[in-house]
Swiss-Prot record:
Principal subcellular localization: cytoplasm
Gene Ontology CC terms: cytoplasm
Organism: Yersinia enterocolitica serotype O:8 / biotype 1B (strain NCTC 13174 / 8081)
Keyword Cytoplasm: yes
Pfam families xref list: FlgN
InterPro entries: FlgN-like, FlgN-like_sf
Keyword annotations from UniProtKB, A to Z: Bacterial flagellum biogenesis, Cytoplasm
Family statement: Belongs to the FlgN family.
Protease in keyword set: no
GO BP: any one term: bacterial-type flagellum assembly
Functional summary from the UniProt entry: Required for the efficient initiation of filament assembly.
Gene (UniProt): flgN
Protein name per its UniProtKB record: Flagella synthesis protein FlgN
Compartment(s): Cytoplasm
Length: 147
């Protein structure tokens, strides 16, 4: 039956939202650690993006199913669906706040790194490394002496 398909869809969305909650918590843990591990953070970000893409697909499927059977969230006439929908809304709201918090943490890291780079650039005047990533020939301490 079509209502059962909708119920399955909502159950799948709930599972994904729970997974996303775990991923957002991992992301927060990484952002709160003293030093961010870029590769680990990138993996978490990719995992988050994958879950969000699947959620978007499931939600589009939900909307199509709703249209086909002429029903609409919050499903007040179908208690089993209404309960799932309410849980989805609660999880989504919590995730919104978690994601906002993580965005603020990330912004703080970016600002800190920008300030650190500004200090390094003003103290040294020139970059220590050339475009190829190798150390430049000029010495910052004075003259070069060959032996």
């Amino acid at each position: 039956m079509v209502v059962e398909r909708l119920q399955t869809n909502l159950d799948q969305q709930l599972e994904l939202l729970e997974s996303l909650k775990t991923v957002v918590a991992q992301e927060q843990q990484l952002l709160c650690s003293g030093r961010i591990q870029g590769i680990v953070l990138q993996g978490v970000t990719e995992q988050k993006s994958s879950i969000l893409a699947t959620l978007a697909y499931l939600d589009q499927t939900r909307l199509t199913t709703e249209k086909n059977i002429n029903i609409q969230a919050p499903y007040s006439n179908v208690p089993a669906l209404a309960e799932r929908w309410q849980r989805i809304l609660e999880l989504a709201e919590g995730l919104r706040y978690g994601n906002l918090h993580n965005g603020l943490l990330l912004q703080q890291h970016i600002e800190h790194n920008t300030q650190a780079l500004a200090v390094l650039n003003t103290r040294h005047g020139q970059s220590l490394y050339g475009p190829d990533g190798h150390a430049k020939g000029a010495s910052l301490l004075g003259r070069k002496i060959g032996i």
